[in-house]
């Protein structure tokens, strides 16, 4: 069986780029979360900025992609953060040599003996102290450091003398709000993780959100999160469990970057068709949108397959595939728990007529279950639930 590899095409995100570049050009003050549904273009957006929009003479980017890395213990976390080297050069000398050829670094350079000491001591204090010193050296060279962590939720439940995520957020607060030393961007497609950050008393006035979701244009108000976290306090601590939907402090703004709206999706189809030396009728484009909506990766998949397949066959297969996956999912739920199955079906029936609904229309445990299974996506700031894609939505309507 062959594997179709799809490279995300970058298209029409100028408003979001302008927003992020404006943030980068200013003094570091907040932690920024870039989030959205699966395959909405978060990483493509960041890569466009890193590779084509930043001046390498002014900025040094450390990009940590946790997507394909299994992190279960302290040593795994350290290996993600650092890039070991041997020799007498200082970290800043190594960085300057590498950055001439690469737009970003995938680890912070560290001498082998120093790394060995950090492995032995197994404390984040030494890790963060070393990173801070490197970042300060970069600033002394007249450059602005930027830290980007992709799929941050992968360390959400990891413990190192308490929950690592709290240690990390406290450190990021120090880098941004206190020292104004480094810009920090965290990417996540896990809307439950974002909801936990949003609802559980973290990072008051220290964080802002950038929503990579349906591309509807424009800006919307952003809502900060309540009090500063304490290291070692677990998610779900009863002392932290209070609702913060109505915040007293509303500062900053976030950008809607999501799956393309219809107008942008149709333009994207034209763009891809031109690249592939093919033509699409208005009826073709309407049909594609009705099946897959504005999900960039699905539009790319359709256009790519048009080189050797009929459009109706492509779309019918994609819908059948999504429908069968949903049917088998529901079958598994029913066999495991009949009562849960009934509640899940009742919840999904709410999407028979509407693509988006208010989050509290579905009981918390049921919506979290469906979000974890990548059936639904939650925007906790707007309080909106929707299927992960038009394709999933069409499958829901067909099955139920």
Swiss-Prot record:
Highest taxon of source: Archaea
Pfam families associated with the record: ATPase_2 (PF01637), MJ1010-like_2nd (PF21690)
Signal sequence interval, chain numbering: none
Presence of keyword Nucleotide-binding: yes
Record has ATP-binding as a keyword: yes
InterPro entries the UniProt entry points to: AAA+_ATPase, Archaeal_ATPase_domain, ATPase_dom, MJ1010-like_2nd, P-loop_NTPase, WH-like_DNA-bd_sf
List of residues binding ATP: 36-43
Record keywords, A-Z: ATP-binding, Nucleotide-binding
Molecular function (Gene Ontology), one example: ATP binding
Membrane-spanning segments: none
Family under the similarity heading: Belongs to the archaeal ATPase family.
The name this protein goes by in its record: Uncharacterized ATP-binding protein MJ1301
Organism taxonomic ancestry: Archaea, Methanobacteriati, Methanobacteriota, Methanomada group, Methanococci
């Amino acid at each position: 069986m062959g594997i179709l590899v799809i490279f995300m095409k970058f298209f029409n995100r100028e408003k979001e780029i302008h927003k992020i570049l404006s943030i980068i050009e200013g003094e570091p003050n907040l932690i920024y979360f870039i989030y959205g549904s699966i395959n909405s273009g978060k990483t493509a957006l960041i890569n466009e900025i890193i590779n084509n929009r930043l001046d390498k003479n002014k900025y040094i980017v450390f990009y940590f992609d946790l997507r394909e890395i299994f992190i279960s213990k302290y040593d795994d976390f350290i290996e993600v953060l650092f890039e070991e080297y041997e020799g007498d050069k200082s970290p800043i000398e190594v960085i300057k040599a590498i950055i001439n050829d690469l737009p970003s670094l995938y680890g912070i350079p560290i001498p082998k003996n120093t790394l060995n000491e950090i492995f032995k001591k197994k404390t984040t204090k030494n890790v963060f102290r070393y990173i801070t010193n490197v970042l300060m050296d970069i600033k002394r060279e007249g450059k602005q450091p930027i830290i980007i962590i992709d799929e941050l939720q992968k360390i959400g439940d990891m413990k190192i003398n308490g929950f690592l995520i709290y240690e990390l957020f406290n450190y990021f607060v120090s880098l941004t709000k206190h020292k104004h030393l480094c810009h920090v961007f965290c990417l996540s497609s896990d809307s439950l993780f974002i909801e936990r950050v949003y609802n559980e008393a973290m990072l008051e006035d220290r964080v802002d959100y950038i929503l990579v979701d349906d591309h509807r244009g424009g800006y919307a108000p952003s809502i900060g999160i309540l009090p500063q976290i304490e290291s070692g306090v677990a998610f779900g601590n009863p002392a932290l469990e209070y609702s913060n939907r109505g915040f007293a402090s509303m500062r900053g703004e976030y950008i809607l970057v999501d799956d393309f709206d219809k107008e942008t999706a149709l333009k994207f189809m034209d763009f891809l068709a031109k690249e592939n030396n093919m033509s699409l009728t208005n009826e073709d484009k309407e049909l594609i949108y009705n099946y897959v909506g504005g999900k960039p990766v699905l539009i790319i998949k359709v256009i790519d397959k048009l080189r050797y397949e009929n459009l109706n066959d492509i779309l019918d297969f994609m819908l059948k595939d999504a429908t069968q996956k949903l049917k088998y999912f529901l079958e598994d739920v029913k066999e495991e728990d009949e009562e849960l199955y009934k509640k899940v079906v009742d919840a999904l029936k709410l999407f028979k007529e509407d693509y988006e609904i208010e989050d509290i229309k579905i009981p918390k445990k049921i919506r979290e279950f469906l979000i974890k299974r990548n059936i639904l996506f939650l925007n906790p700031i707007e309080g909106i639930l929707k299927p992960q894609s038009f394709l999933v939505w069409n499958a829901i309507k067909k099955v139920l």
